[in-house]
Swiss-Prot record:
The keyword Cell division is assigned to this record: no
Organism encoding this protein: Bos taurus (Bovine)
Name this protein carries in UniProt: Myelin protein zero-like protein 3
Gene3D superfamilies according to UniProt: Immunoglobulins
A GO cellular component annotation in the UniProt record: plasma membrane
Cytoplasmic side: 180-234
Pfam families: V-set
Length: 234
């Protein structure tokens, strides 16, 4: 009787361990990980992409669903703005009517959407929920959207970049022309000191030199104009 009782006691002792392993196994099998940007900044009138990606341990089927919700600032009320299940179902009511577009790909784990013609009234919290049965338990990440007007500083930086793109190539061309002029001038001085008599070909080169001088002066003048425009811009 004692020998028969030992195996039974061991079996009972293993029950809790097996139970823990079983539940851990279920957790791993049915895990669904979702990621989204915590903060997104956009500008009025410019399309904004809200990124959402997911990883599922199960194969993608037509049972997969995606839901995007919106919650205004300082409010507990949420509204559905997009639903996906084999097809796209953007909201047909509310402030986001006809402004939500699907830009994701479920087979690549992408559940992103885009907002067209955003305004500052769109500021708030957006949540992305994905279910891919049997993976239904997951986190629900939230994205804080901030929409603002493009400020003067942003516009100024664009103007500055454009000015640099125009100024630098012009400066390089002028420098190359000046170097070429300097080399030709040094060669002519050496020849004049040695009493070298110019041939008809060299006379033709001098004519070309005069043309190059005029071109160089014109380029220098253009560079000065660019410099003056650059200074007026800033």
């Amino acid at each position: 009787m004692q020998q028969s009782g030992v195996p039974g006691s061991r079996g009972c002792a293993l029950c809790p361990l097996l139970g823990v392993l079983f539940f851990q196994g279920v957790y791993v099998i049915f895990s669904l990980e979702i990621k989204a940007d915590a903060h997104v900044r956009g500008y009025v009138g410019e399309n904004i992409k809200l990124r959402c990606t997911f990883k599922s341990s199960s194969s993608i089927t037509d049972k997969l669903t995606i839901d995007w919700t919106y919650r205004p600032p300082s409010s507990s009320r949420t509204e559905s703005i997009f639903h996906y299940q084999s097809f796209q179902y953007p909201t047909t009511a509310g402030t986001f009517r006809d402004r939500i577009s699907w830009v994701g790909d479920v087979y690549k784990g992408d559940a992103s959407i885009s907002i067209s013609n955003p305004t500052m009234k769109d500021n708030g919290t957006f949540s992305c929920a994905v279910k891919n049965p049997p993976d239904v338990h997951h986190n629900i990440p939230a994205t804080e959207l901030t929409v603002t007007e493009r400020g003067f500083g942003t516009m100024l930086s664009s103007v500055a970049l454009l000015s640099i793109l125009v100024f630098i190539p012009s400066t390089v061309v002028v420098i190359l022309l000046l170097v070429r002029m300097g080399r030709k001038s040094a060669g002519l001085k050496k020849r004049s000191k040695s009493g070298y008599k110019k041939s008809s070909i060299e006379v033709s080169d001098d004519t070309d030199q005069e043309g190059d001088d005029c071109m160089a002066k014109l380029c220098v003048r253009c560079a000065e104009c660019v410099d003056s425009d650059y200074e007026e811009t800033y």
